């Protein structure tokens, strides 16, 4: 054996490459109850799990909502390798629409081969790029940007008579975030949290604004400065018919501020000693009248300690017929003593019936029947929180600083408003929560193909109501095309006016909304 051959044997040319049998390119054979099948992976196909998103993108483009939001975004980059604003905001939009709750969930979107380019994006950003995007931005500038676009989403509606619901919700936290303080947290007592003070347009279920504060600032007194700044920014013709809230908002400071501005209100009162005395006095009255749904009510005047004046109050009561319901409500009252339950007070008379009571304070002139219904309608605010926290991401997207938590809360609220308005074009008679509207109007397998310069997205929906949507979604597209083609001379705010009039045709009965004057539009 020659020396060259000996060297070749002693020092082989590295390890041989392993030949993988049944790798990703070759596929895999799987034994199923339907027989053996061959599974292959295709990493290059232009497919998406959100095949119907193109209709929503057309909605945003026709109204000018997406372009205005991206162009006015205060995020700036100096590095030539930094992502474009369109890519960052587009990634956030896709993630929120998909129902994600954490930045890490963005990874699931990285290989969507259809929708990013429909939004004008060049790529889907990583979770780190999205998380860091707003870290250096000026907070005041960013808040003004988001507040402005939130108002654009609903401003024409304020020319109609509307009700403002105010409420707060707690977001439990599990780290060392700024503002993560122990406070009122009925779901997880002792757990640090943030609190979201939120204003809603009742019935239409749109978010007007949201403010994120530390977990020990759940009281309405912490939210009132920003709330009254918001109210004062509206002209008289755009202010709500009345403001509605639970017992946290029925305070002297809140009611006096409303009276000073000549804004009507309806609040529930905490059942402290003088309120309970009023209930006891009302028990023997004979002038109880129907308040709807089994409730009866009487009217009285009340001036609590610390109040500047006497105010009209309505005492409501409902007979308790189900002993099991009574036991459950008593258990909840014992375990969460600070919680204002529907059973705020139970009057027990020997050998007599049991009643649950609620006391409302109001400046409205309405009769008791209407006031009782008004307050029961406030339960919709709780449904809003349930949807936004459990279906839209208000329970997540948390960072160490409070600023970015506030930015994401308003961003999610804006996207929620956009999607809610879009879904009403398909389902005008009611609000469809995301758990219903996403499978119906968003989720579907979409495959994109291009031939002779024509791009086609083939959609396959597995929903039982897919045939209905196959006619509803193209009808929305036809309407938007009419707005674009027949109203070329109109500005974006004017087009948005027409679109909102169609969105709320069920409420407006065919009327066109009046032109808003108090928020300047883009166009």
What are these regions (language model features)?
Residues 2-191, 195-217, 221-236, 423, ...:
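Dynamic "connector" segments at or just before major functional cores
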Residues 240-250:
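Acidic/histidine-rich, metal-coordinating catalytic segments
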Residues 78-87, 187, 350-351, 399-408:
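Structural motif
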Residues 2-12, 24-35, 39, 264-390, ...:
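An anionic, glycine-rich sequence signature occurring as long contiguous blocks
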Residues 255-264:
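Short, surface-exposed basic-aromatic patches at helix termini and helix-loop junctions that form
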Residues 106, 368-411, 415-419:
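Short amphipathic alpha-helical "interface-anchor" segments enriched in bulky aromatics
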Residues 395-458, 462-463:
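Basic, amphipathic alpha-helical segments enriched in Lys/Arg and hydrophobic/aromatic residues
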């Amino acid at each position: 054996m020659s020396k060259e051959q000996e060297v070749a044997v002693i020092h082989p040319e590295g390890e041989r490459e392993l030949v993988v049998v049944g790798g990703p390119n070759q596929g895999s054979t799987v034994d199923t109850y339907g027989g053996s099948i061959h599974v292959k992976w295709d990493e290059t196909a232009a497919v998406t799990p959100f095949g119907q998103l193109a209709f929503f993108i057309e909605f945003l483009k026709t109204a000018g909502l997406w372009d205005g939001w991206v162009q006015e975004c205060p995020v700036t980059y100096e590095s030539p390798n930094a992502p474009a604003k369109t890519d960052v905001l587009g990634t956030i939009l896709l993630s929120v629409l998909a129902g994600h709750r954490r930045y890490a969930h963005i990874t699931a979107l990285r290989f969507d081969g259809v929708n990013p380019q429909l939004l004008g994006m060049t790529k889907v950003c990583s979770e780190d790029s999205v998380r860091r995007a707003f870290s250096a931005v000026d907070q005041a500038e960013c808040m003004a940007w988001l507040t402005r676009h939130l108002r654009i989403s609903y401003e024409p509606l304020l020319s109609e008579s509307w009700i403002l619901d105010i409420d707060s919700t707690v977001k439990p936290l599990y780290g060392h975030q700024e503002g993560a303080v122990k406070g009122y947290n009925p779901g997880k007592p002792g757990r640090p949290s943030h609190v979201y003070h939120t204003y809603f347009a009742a019935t239409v279920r749109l978010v007007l604004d949201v403010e994120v504060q530390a977990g020990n600032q759940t009281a309405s007194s912490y939210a009132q400065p920003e709330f009254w700044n918001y109210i004062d920014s509206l002209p008289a013709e755009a202010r709500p018919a009345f403001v509605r809230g639970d017992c946290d908002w029925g305070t002297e400071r809140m009611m006096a501020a409303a009276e000073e501005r000549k804004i009507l209100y309806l609040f529930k009162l905490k059942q402290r000693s003088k309120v309970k005395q009023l209930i006891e006095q009302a028990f023997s009255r004979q002038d109880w009248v129907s308040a709807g749904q089994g409730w009866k009510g009487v009217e009285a005047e009340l001036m609590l300690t610390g109040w500047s004046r006497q105010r009209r109050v309505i005492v409501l009561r409902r007979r308790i017929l189900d002993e099991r319901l009574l036991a459950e409500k008593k258990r909840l009252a014992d375990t969460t003593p600070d919680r204002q339950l529907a059973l705020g007070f139970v009057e027990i008379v020997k050998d007599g019936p049991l009643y649950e009571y609620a006391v409302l304070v109001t400046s409205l002139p309405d009769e008791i029947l209407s006031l009782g219904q008004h307050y029961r309608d406030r339960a919709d605010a709780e449904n809003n929180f349930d949807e936004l926290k459990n279906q839209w991401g208000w329970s997540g997207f948390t960072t160490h600083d409070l600023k970015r938590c506030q930015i994401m809360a308003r961003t999610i609220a804006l996207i929620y408003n956009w999607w809610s308005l879009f879904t009403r074009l398909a389902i005008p008679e009611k609000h469809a929560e995301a758990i219903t509207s996403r499978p119906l109007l968003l989720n579907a397998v979409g495959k994109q193909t291009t031939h002779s310069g024509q791009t086609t997205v083939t959609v396959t929906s597995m929903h039982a109501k897919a045939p209905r949507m196959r006619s509803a979604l193209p009808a929305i597209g036809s309407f938007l095309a009419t707005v674009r083609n027949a109203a070329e001379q109109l500005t974006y705010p004017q087009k948005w006016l027409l679109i909102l009039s169609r969105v709320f045709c069920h409420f407006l009965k065919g009327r066109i909304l009046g032109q808003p004057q108090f928020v300047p539009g883009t166009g």
